[in-house]
């Protein structure tokens, strides 16, 4: 180098300097530089230029060549100073100093030219050799010496190269300004980058030793440049309008510290590596932005597009021949496709992973752009737009989704293009720290006026860096001082940024970026108004990285990859120019985040501003610009994550202030996630929008509920679970998927019709069959009466509804929980969680942070409505078809709903197929689907004692297990704001419970349960076992999968105008079993569950709770109740095939209605208590079978006035029929069970029963017809007046016994006031006491009252408002017997129309009189039919092998007939136990039984009755028991009787309409002195009876009830305890509620003493103050003895019973009236029986003996002769009508004498027939008769028992008898002859015929007598039709034989 140190000449120096300036900078100047214009100091080597304006065109030309997206608008240079060290040119560096450089740029408009081929801006434009040649050739004066050889030129070039490498450029106060004006009237924006100092030099300047040697022929492969910056500031300016003065730019960012950039440039393409590599370091970066600035910067960055996709596509979309590279690409793609086809993997929806779906890569297959296929294009768009559109409901679909998305985060899918990509640029930056402060308001009201200046002054003033510590908490005070307003702040340290650009052929580019954060924190700092301290929300923090490992592993790693490829524009119907696929992966360390909805709402508003797309103004006829099809995949993963869910305080007031501070509760839910992974996919493009999926998975989730200072409670645990269907260890992971579907057209006008739809517009189908709309309710209509029963849909209907709703929802949330455990340690925690979630989280509404007022009031920082949408023209739809569009009825689903959406800018067919038909269905707002594979809910509740006090140290526990459960919810269904649905399903559910469990410490960490039954809890509700359900036991298999065990569907409808919310709740429980456990009322499972769920709602600000109406429909199908008593050896099972509960529940209303419908239910008993699992058919006995039962409960809270207008509690029951199937032992066991349940036997161990001798002695000491010798306190405290009245009644009853049964004496007793108070309507007031002046009137009225009550019910007449007139002496017969006409009114009778009101409907026999008070409690049973089947034998216990018949043993037994095909044992429910005898059966049927029990309030209500009566007698309760028809049927095989007991009717005694066979009425009244217990007035009425008694049936009933009574355990009261007895109350009616039902039916019911009684609370018998048997009951008795029995009843009685034959014996039960008081039901029965027996013995023996044998017919015979002679005389004496008397006598003679004669003749003929049959049997040979002949004889004998209805049938039957007899005789002779011939030949045949001759001779006599009997019977029935009816009821017919 020494030879180059010769001195330079001045001419050369001037030319070199001028040339350098002109060559490098001349064309950028507006004026050409010359030597004269230069300010040169050649000796010092400096050049200076000032105030230079840049040439815009030249600079833009350079920028275009570099593909810069910016262009220069204005450029100015303050000064340029160039210093050349001539003395040390090769050792020192040249300097260029540029001061005051100002560049104003703007985004380039229009396409850019071709790609840049030169990089001279970095390599100084040319080589040094060229520079040397030009320099020496440019105008140098001709030297005197000759030119230097070529070596000198190279040495000169080497010198120049050395000098150029050492040039150092310094920029001072540089300002780069980028302006952007949208051009649509909006204000522009400008961003300035101000650099205080920038130094640019080669790396050789810093370290000359590392510089490569200079070679002018071979330039270095890499160039290294160094940039050093200092004082970098970012400023923002909003361009003002023309008339407004400009404002100074506002600083938005600063770079503190020293910045250094190392630029590495590759000059030789043969070397690997990127062409450009930049590595830099930066101290820290601070940014301060407002929402307005953020939006404007986003628009600026959108305008400054780094890649012009349209220009790129235009350049590269050229047709060219296939080259070698193209062939290689085709070969590579084909190989990959073949390999993928061999593996046979499913097609992935990702266009990068599956080349078959990614047909947009047409350059891989076709080089010519015109060869693309439109079909392939449509298929490609279909595949990209329909990805995961239909969401999955079932778990297997979820597992498929998990497996399909199993790619590891950050790993790119294999792409054949990546191998051919070449690195182009690489950027690596290291930042010491980054802070981004985003203001939440544009103009903060608080803080200093110049916030930006104050902010950056605070940070620039500090000497030390802001990131000196590893904790960010020390920065918070500095930020409080720097920015005292609400903002969101991102703070990061040790930031490493890496950016790489790869390019390839066909215009493909790949951009990848990685960012590492050593520490990271994202905070929201909210400054409430008027506060000095902010409130922080830690959006993202990393508490675990603050230790020593912070530098070892970054807390956040962000990877972003973008692949850009072009799409040919020659493809039809596509306006897309580029396809961009981006993948963003974020790997975090263990992080923590606060989830606060208010903060997220404010943050989302800011992010929404940054993501608003800038749309160009669209005209009517303008063609849409080419758009970019973009697909972005976002992935986030971390080892662990902690999410703290903060519950907001819901504020629904009209104008809430979102900036008033954090409106959050003190409680929070901490969610700890293990291995969380988040994935999202966003797509945008010109085609139809596609759904957006957000997916979050984790392996484990632990939820902890924190309530202020209380200890944290672990309440939730979710974990993965093994797939039971998978062979390997495949897990289901917890998963949350959020799907945001694109918003469909806002109106129905924005739908373009298809071709088929256009045809449909012209031709409408007259009959259009549509499928029903999907619904969560069952489409099968189920009606009950006139009401439709709403039932949840089956699983298929549920799935259809859910999948359709999810697909048509604006936003859907799907949650999969493989294994979940919810723990609720107390009601307080549950109430807190309930209110936080239901009343805070779900009621929270986002604030209106993006208002859209008028432009004048538009705040800065928020876009107007034009920024979000633009108006565009759509195709108008025909109004004719529009009617179907708006048809949202359930029948509006048809095939034409599959219309597709068309893009407005598209041409041709549809772009993509829609998943459903949103054209006819509006979108729902939000839908949720939660799937639980296995789940458990554990709830700890309080345990209370019988007094309602909480027990210490114990608690109740409820555990609910669920398998395969789904929870679905949708709000604003089909766009209707007030409509929503809620569904809950579970294939299997089990409830465990225990009332009292010892307290144990709560777990600090919730473990996953094993889902095994809890050991300390008892199963309460569980799936029915295989052998329990009736259908399951019947072996019905192969019918597929039935409904789920639990199904619930709820429809929620809110009427905002009325503020009424209606819930339609339907619940179905299928094949479930309830295990019943007796417990205290406060400790039952339902009491504890309801008490646990009964929480109070916290008020919500600005929310008025609507009136809630709940319509409840609960359906139980094939369910059962299992009860196993502790101290009774029996197991009880109640099954119900269908059980429906319906109710209307209205909050804040006084009335509540509940209806139960029970269909096909049964009660079973079993004595196998030691076996755990039993079979229903094998081990149980059905004792109760209910066909249909309806139960209605109505409650009323009462009025504020305290008066009752309706009962507080009313129960109504009605049913079809109830069957009771029992033997004596099973019936006794049923009675014992009822007693056990009523006495709550499980809660009281059985005490020692008293000895039988004590019980017998007690019974013998009591006289049945007298009062007890030692009356109880209640009886002793009767007032003196009642005692006197009782004595008078006793004396009168003795006088009545001496009179005939029909005679009555005047009764003058004042006791009449005690006769059913109020049941007389229109009667005069009660008579005064004894001795009063109105005693005679009282006696007359009392007698007439008696007669009237005997004829009918007084209250019936009273209820219909009719009045019976009472007249003195009415009804008393005269002494001489002559009738006397009494004139009541002397004048004419005036008839007044309408005087009596007409009854509205039929008479209600159960209704109380009108003046009775309104009852507080009413129990009504209406038309309940009961059939009691009494079987012989035993259902339980040991049974003999031969199964002897109990009750028919010994000589009483008769040969039983064969059972027909319809016997009861063919029905499995009636098969009973192994010892049940089905041929021994009797049936007791009570048809249409009605019962009413009313309890009246303690205070008497005002009524029309007299005050004196109310003061004397106050009703407490009233009972009415009515049996419309009572029958006892004889079904014994040994008996021919049909009906054992029934109602007797005849022509003389026809049955009255609406008459009841048995009526019992009881009225309990309070005594007048209030000293005793309640007193009862009892009235019984009975209709005439007919008894047909067979001896076997009589003895069977005797044995049955004897065994029944012996098997019933005696009622022994248990220990008196607080829970076993009712508490003493002030209301005397309270203890009567439990006694009312048993007053009429059983005598064992007792009532406890009233609260006003001073007696001990032991139960006392009922005191009957009055007992009346109101009607005289005639009884007709037929008895048929069969055999003598002397072993049980004695010799005489046995002979009498066996030989007696009674026919129409008449008995009468006389009227009874007992007013002297009876204590106990047994005394009442004893009194009635004693009275009736005495009357029968004294007065009715002739009528009883008149039916012995034929005596009845004989008496009728003489009665007819007497009537024939006496009736004319009696009629003549009466009124002189002799002919009328003759007619009556002849009629009586015909009906009595003729029928009696025919009956006697028939008896004689039947006696002859019986004698002939006996002779026939004696003379008949012993040879067997054929079976067919026996069958014919038996059939004829059965028909023989049926008498003909009239003479015609008698003649026909006689003819048939003779004909069949002759045929039978001939057939018998033929059979005997043929059989004898077969055995012995001719001799045998002749012998057989001879042996058959004697019976054949007798046979005509039998036939003649039988035919005569038929004729006589027909004649008798013709004369007396009642005889035929009685015969048909008495004897069995052909159908009854079976």
From Swiss-Prot:
Effect of mutating residue 304 to R: In Mutant 1; abolished lipid transfer activity. In Mutant 2; abolished lipid transfer activity
Known catalytic reactions: a 1,2-diacyl-sn-glycero-3-phospho-L-serine(in) = a 1,2-diacyl-sn-glycero-3-phospho-L-serine(out); a 1,2-diacyl-sn-glycero-3-phosphoethanolamine(in) = a 1,2-diacyl-sn-glycero-3-phosphoethanolamine(out)
Biological-process GO terms, alphabetical: autophagosome assembly; autophagy of mitochondrion; glycophagy; pexophagy; piecemeal microautophagy of the nucleus; positive regulation of autophagosome assembly; positive regulation of autophagy; reticulophagy
PTM sites of type Phosphoserine: 765, 878, 892, 894, 1266, 1301, 1309, 1402
Ranges of biased composition (kind: Acidic residues): 1343-1359
GO CC annotations on file: endoplasmic reticulum membrane; lipid droplet; organelle membrane contact site; phagophore; phagophore assembly site; phagophore assembly site membrane
Ranges for region Disordered: 1242-1272, 1315-1359, 1438-1476, 1614-1657
A GO MF term: protein-membrane adaptor activity
Matches recorded under InterPro entries: ATG2 (IPR026849)
Effect of residue 285 to R: In Mutant 1; abolished lipid transfer activity
Impact after mutating residue 285 to E: In Mutant 2; abolished lipid transfer activity
Compartment annotation: Preautophagosomal structure membrane; Lipid droplet; Endoplasmic reticulum membrane
Topology in membrane: Peripheral membrane protein
Domain Chorein N-terminal as annotated: residue spans: 14-111
Outcome of substituting residue 167 to K: In Mutant 2; abolished lipid transfer activity
Keywords: Autophagy, Endoplasmic reticulum, Lipid droplet, Lipid transport, Membrane, Phosphoprotein, Transport
Domain of life the protein comes from: Eukaryota
Family of this protein: Belongs to the ATG2 family.
Domain notes: The chorein N-terminal domain mediates lipid transfer activity.
Subunit (UniProt): Interacts with ATG9A (via C-terminus). Interacts (via WIPI-interacting region) with WDR45B/WIPI3. Interacts (via WIPI-interacting region) with WDR45/WIPI4. Interacts with TMEM41B. Interacts with VMP1.
Protein name (Swiss-Prot/TrEMBL): Autophagy-related protein 2 homolog A
Organism: Homo sapiens (Human)
Gene this chain is encoded by: ATG2A
């Amino acid at each position: 180098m020494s030879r180059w140190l010769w001195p330079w000449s001045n001419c050369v120096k001037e030319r070199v300097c001028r040339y350098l300036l002109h060559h490098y900078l001349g064309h950028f100047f507006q004026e050409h530089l010359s030597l004269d214009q230069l300010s040169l100091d050649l000796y010092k080597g400096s050049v200076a230029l000032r105030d230079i304006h840049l040439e815009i065109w030249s600079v833009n030309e350079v920028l275009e060549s570099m593909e810069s997206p910016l262009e220069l608008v204005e450029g100015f240079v303050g000064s340029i100073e160039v210093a050349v060290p001539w003395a040390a040119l090769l050792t020192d560096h040249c300097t260029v100093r540029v001061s005051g450089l100002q560049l104003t740029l703007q985004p380039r408009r229009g396409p850019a030219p071709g790609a840049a081929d030169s990089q001279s801006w970095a390599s100084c434009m040319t080589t040094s050799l060229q520079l040397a040649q030009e320099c020496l050739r440019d105008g140098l004066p001709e030297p005197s010496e000759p030119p230097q050889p070529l070596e000198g030129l190279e040495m000169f070039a080497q010198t120049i190269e050395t000098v150029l490498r050492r040039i150092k450029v310094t920029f001072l106060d540089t300002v780069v300004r980028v302006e952007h004006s949208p051009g649509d009237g909006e204000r522009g924006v400008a961003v300035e980058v101000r650099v205080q100092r920038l130094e640019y030099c080669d790396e050789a300047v810093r370290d000359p030793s590392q510089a490569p040697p200079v070679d002018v022929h071979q330039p270095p492969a890499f160039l290294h440049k160094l940039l050093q910056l200092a004082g970098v500031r970012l400023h923002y300016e909003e361009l003002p309008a023309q008339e407004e003065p400009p404002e100074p730019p506002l600083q938005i960012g600063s770079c503190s510290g020293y910045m250094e950039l190392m630029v590495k440039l590759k000059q030789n393409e043969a070397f690997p590596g990127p062409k450009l590599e930049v590595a830099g370091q930066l101290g820290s970066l601070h940014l301060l932005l407002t929402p307005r600035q953020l939006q404007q910067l986003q628009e600026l960055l959108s305008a400054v597009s780094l890649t012009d996709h349209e220009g790129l596509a235009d350049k590269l979309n050229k047709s060219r021949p296939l080259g070698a590279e193209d062939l290689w690409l085709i070969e590579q793609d084909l190989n990959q496709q073949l390999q993928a086809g061999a593996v046979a993997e499913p097609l992935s929806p990702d266009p990068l992973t599956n080349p078959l779906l990614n047909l947009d890569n047409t350059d891989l297959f076709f080089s010519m752009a015109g060869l693309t296929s439109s079909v392939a294009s449509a298929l490609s768009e279909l595949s990209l737009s329909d990805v995961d559109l239909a969401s999955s409901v079932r778990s297997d679909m979820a597992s498929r989704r998990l497996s399909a998305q199993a790619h590891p985060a950050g790993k790119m899918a294999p792409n054949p293009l990546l191998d051919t990509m070449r690195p182009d640029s690489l950027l690596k930056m290291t930042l010491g720290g980054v802070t981004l402060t985003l203001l939440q308001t544009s103009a903060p009201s608080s803080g200093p006026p110049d916030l930006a200046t104050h902010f950056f002054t605070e940070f620039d003033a500090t000497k030390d860096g802001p990131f000196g510590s590893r904790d960010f908490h020390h920065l918070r005070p500095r930020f409080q001082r720097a920015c005292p307003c609400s903002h969101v702040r991102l703070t990061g340290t040790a930031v490493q940024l890496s950016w790489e650009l790869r390019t390839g052929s066909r215009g493909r580019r790949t951009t990848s970026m990685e960012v590492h954060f050593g520490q990271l924190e994202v905070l929201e700092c909210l400054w409430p108004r008027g506060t000095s301290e902010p409130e922080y929300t830690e959006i993202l923090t990393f508490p675990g990285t603050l230790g020593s490992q912070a530098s070892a592993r970054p807390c956040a790693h962000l990877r972003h990859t973008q692949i850009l490829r072009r799409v040919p524009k020659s493809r039809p119907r596509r306006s897309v120019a580029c396809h961009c696929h981006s993948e963003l992966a974020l790997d975090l360390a263990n992080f923590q985040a606060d989830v606060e909805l208010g903060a997220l709402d404010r943050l989302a508003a800011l992010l929404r501003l940054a993501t608003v797309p800038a749309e160009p103004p669209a005209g009517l006829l303008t063609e849409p610009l080419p758009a970019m099809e973009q697909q972005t995949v976002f992935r986030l993963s971390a080892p662990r994550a902690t999410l703290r869910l903060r519950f907001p305080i819901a504020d629904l007031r009209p104008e809430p202030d979102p900036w008033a501070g954090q409106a959050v509760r003190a409680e929070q839910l901490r969610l700890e996630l293990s291995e969380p992974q988040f994935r999202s996919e966003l797509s945008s493009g010109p085609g139809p929008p596609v759904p957006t999926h957000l997916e979050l998975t984790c392996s484990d989730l632990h939820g902890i509920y924190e309530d202020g200072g209380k200890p944290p409670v672990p309440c939730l645990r979710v974990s993965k679970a093994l797939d039971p269907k998978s062979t390997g260890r495949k897990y289901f992971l917890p998963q949350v998927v959020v799907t945001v579907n694109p918003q469909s057209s806002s109106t129905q006008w924005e739908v373009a019709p298809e071709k088929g739809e256009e045809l449909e517009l012209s031709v409408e189908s007259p009959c259009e069959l549509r499928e029903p709309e999907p619904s969560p309710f069952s489409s099968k209509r189920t009606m009950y009466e006139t009401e439709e029963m709403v039932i949840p849909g089956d699983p298929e209907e549920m799935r259809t509804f859910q999948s359709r709703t999810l697909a048509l929802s604006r936003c859907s949330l799907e949650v999969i929980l493989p294994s979940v455990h919810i723990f609720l340690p107390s009601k307080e925690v549950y109430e807190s969680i309930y209110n936080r979630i239901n009343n805070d989280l779900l009621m929270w509404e986002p604030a209106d942070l993006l208002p859209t007022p008028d432009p004048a009031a538009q705040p800065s920082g928020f876009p107007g409505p034009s920024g979000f949408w633009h108006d565009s023209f759509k195709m108008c739809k025909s109004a004719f078809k529009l009617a179907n569009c708006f048809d949202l009825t359930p029948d509006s689903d048809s095939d034409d709903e599959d219309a597709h959406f068309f893009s407005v800018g598209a041409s041709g067919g549809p772009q993509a197929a829609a998943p459903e038909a949103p054209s006819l269905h509006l979108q729902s707002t939000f839908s949720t689907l939660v799937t639980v594979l296995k789940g458990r809910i554990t709830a700890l509740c309080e345990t209370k004692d019988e007094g309602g006090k909480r027990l210490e140290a114990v608690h109740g526990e409820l555990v609910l297990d669920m398998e395969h459960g789904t929870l679905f919810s949708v709000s604003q269904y089909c766009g209707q704001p007030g409509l929503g649905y809620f569904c809950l399903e579970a294939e299997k559910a089990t409830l465990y419970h225990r009332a009292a469990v010892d307290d144990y410490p709560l777990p600090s960490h919730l473990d996953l349960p094993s889902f095994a039954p809890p050991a300390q809890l008892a199963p309460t509700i569980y799936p029915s076992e295989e052998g329990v359900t009736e259908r399951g036991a019947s072996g019905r298999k192969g019918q597929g999968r039935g409904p789920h065990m639990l199904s619930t569907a709820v429809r929620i409808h809110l009427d905002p105008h009325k503020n009424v919310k209606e819930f339609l709740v339907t619940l179905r429980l299928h094949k479930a079993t309830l295990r019943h456990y007796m417990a205290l009322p406060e400790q039952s499972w339902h009491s504890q569950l309801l008490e646990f769920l009964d929480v109070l709602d916290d008020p919500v600000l600005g929310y008025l709770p609507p009136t809630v109406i709940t319509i409840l429909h609960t359906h139980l199908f094939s369910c059962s109740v299992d009860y196993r008593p502790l101290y009774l050896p029996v197991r009880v099972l109640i099954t119900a095939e269908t059980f429906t509960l319906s109710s209307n529940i209205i909050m804040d209303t006084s009335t509540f209605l509940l209806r139960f419908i029970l269909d096909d239910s049964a009660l079973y008993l079993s004595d196998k208590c030691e076996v755990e699992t039993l079979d229903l058919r094998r081990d149980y006995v059905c004792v109760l079978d209910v066909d249909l039962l309806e139960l209605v409960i109505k409650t009323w809270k009462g009025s504020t006035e305290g008066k009752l207008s309706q009962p507080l509690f009313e129960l109504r029951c009605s049913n079809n029929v109830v069957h009771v199937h029992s033997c004596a032992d099973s019936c006794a066991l049923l009675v014992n069970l009822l007693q056990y349940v009523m006495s709550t036997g499980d809660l009281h161990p059985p005490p020692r029963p008293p000895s039988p001798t004590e019980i017998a002695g007690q019974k013998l000491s009591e006289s049945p017809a007298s009062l007890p010798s030692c009356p109880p306190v209640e009886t002793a405290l009767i007032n003196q007046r009642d005692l006197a009245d009782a004595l008078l009644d006793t004396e009168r009853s003795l006088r009545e016994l001496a009179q005939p049964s029909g005679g009555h004496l005047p009764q003058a007793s004042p006791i009449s006031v005690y006769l059913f108070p109020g049941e007389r309507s229109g009667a005069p007031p009660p008579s005064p006491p004894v001795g009063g002046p109105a005693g005679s009137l009282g006696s007359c009225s009392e007698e007439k009252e008696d007669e009237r009550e005997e004829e009918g019910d007084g209250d019936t007449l009273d209820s219909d408002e009719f009045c019976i007139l009472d007249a003195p002496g009415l009804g008393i017969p005269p002494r001489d017997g002559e009738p006397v006409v009494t004139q009541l009114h002397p004048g004419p009778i005036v008839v007044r129309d309408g005087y009596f009101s007409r009854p509205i409907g039929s008479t209600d026999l159960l209704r109380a009189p009108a003046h009775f008070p309104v009852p507080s409690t009413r129990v009504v049973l209406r038309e309940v039919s009961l059939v009691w089947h009494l079987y012989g034998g035993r259902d339980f216990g040991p049974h003999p092998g031969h199964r002897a018949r109990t009750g028919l043993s010994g000589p009483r037994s008769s040969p039983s007939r064969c059972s027909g095909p319809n016997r009861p044992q063919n029905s499995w429910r009636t098969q009973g136990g192994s010892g049940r005898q089905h041929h021994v059966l009797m049936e007791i049927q009570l048809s249409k039984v009605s019962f009413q029990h009313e309890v009246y309030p303690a205070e008497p209500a005002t009524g029309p009755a007299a005050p004196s009566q109310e003061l004397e007698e106050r009703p407490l309760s009233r009972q009415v028991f009515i049996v419309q028809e009572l029958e006892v049927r004889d079904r014994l095989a040994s008996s021919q009787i049909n009906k054992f007991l029934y109602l007797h009717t005849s022509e003389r005694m026809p049955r009255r309409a609406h008459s009841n066979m048995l009526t019992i009425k009881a009225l309990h009244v309070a005594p007048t002195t209030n000293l005793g217990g309640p007193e009862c007035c009892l009235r019984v009425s009975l209709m005439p009876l007919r008894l047909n008694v067979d001896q076997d049936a009589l003895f069977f009933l005797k044995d049955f009830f004897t065994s029944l009574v012996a098997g019933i355990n005696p009622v022994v009261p248990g220990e008196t305890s607080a829970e076993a007895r009712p508490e003493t109350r002030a209301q005397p009616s309270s203890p009567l509620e439990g006694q009312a039902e048993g007053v009429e039916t059983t005598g064992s019911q007792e009532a406890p003493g009233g609260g006003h009684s001073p007696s001990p609370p032991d139960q006392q018998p009922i005191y009957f103050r009055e007992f009346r048997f109101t009607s005289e009951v005639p009884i007709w008795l037929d008895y048929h003895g069969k055999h003598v029995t002397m072993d049980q009843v004695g010799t005489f009685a046995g002979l009498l019973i066996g030989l007696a034959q009674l026919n129409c014996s008449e008995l009468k039960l006389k009227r009874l009236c007992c007013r002297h008081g009876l204590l106990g039901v047994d005394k009442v029965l004893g009194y009635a029986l004693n009275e009736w027996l005495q009357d029968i013995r004294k007065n009715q023996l002739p009528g009883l003996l008149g039916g012995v044998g034929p005596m009845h017919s004989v008496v009728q015979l003489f009665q007819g002769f007497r009537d024939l002679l006496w009736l004319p005389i009696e009629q003549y004496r009466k009124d002189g009508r002799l002919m009328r008397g003759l007619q009556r006598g002849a009629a009586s003679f015909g009906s009595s004498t003729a029928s009696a004669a025919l009956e006697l003749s028939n008896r004689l003929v039947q006696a002859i027939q019986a004698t002939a049959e006996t002779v026939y049997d004696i003379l008949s040979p012993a040879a067997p008769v054929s079976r067919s002949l026996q069958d014919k004889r038996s059939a004829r004998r059965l028909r023989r028992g049926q008498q003909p209805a009239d003479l015609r049938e008698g003649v026909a039957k006689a003819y048939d008898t003779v004909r069949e007899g002759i045929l039978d005789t001939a057939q018998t002779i033929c059979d005997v002859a043929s059989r004898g011939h077969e055995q012995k030949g001719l001799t045998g045949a002749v012998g057989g015929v001879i042996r058959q001759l004697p019976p054949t001779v007798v046979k005509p006599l039998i036939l003649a007598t039988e035919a005569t009997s038929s004729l006589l019977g027909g004649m008798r029935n013709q004369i007396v039709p009642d005889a035929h009816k009685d015969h048909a009821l008495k004897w069995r017919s052909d159908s009854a034989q079976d």
